[in-house]
């Protein structure tokens, strides 16, 4: 039970690959499926955050206040800097109408609801979307909303034994996957932006974090390197 989710070079490598794929997709450099990098990010975030919460609660030292303070310190300073930089640049080059729209998007970004605002105003895959300098903050909105939901669910799961907690988390993940699959077919625009349709990826990562807690041998360095190599091949394919 003393296994913790520490720094992982393999995860950093997958994160770097995910960023590269998204960048190549947006620059139109022959990677039409590069947006899968977003999915990789969500699973990694679920694994790191979900695993941390689960382990901290089992060890008896989880603190709601400390959890959110750490999230704020990690995300908000860089996010504010990006928003200010974008605002300053766009002040000189955008039209008054576009600048007003940027103000709305910036406020939504800082309030962790940029995915909802963009869902209501833009088609992610349309050429015009590329002109929105805060377009990519939608995924951060999804992650931040997950930070509000995950602790409550995972803290409930720690009240049950290992087998039942795994079963419940697996059931939640499968239910969210079914919702996402149905949404992708029926309302793909909403399924791209909104957290209920993205939750299964984050919960799948959290499930892996729980597995890491109870089965650390399955996450040895050799096993991790093998799984990372397989992951890279699957993403590249």
PLM features: residue spans?
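Membrane-interface helix/loop caps of multi-pass membrane proteins
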Residues: 1-237
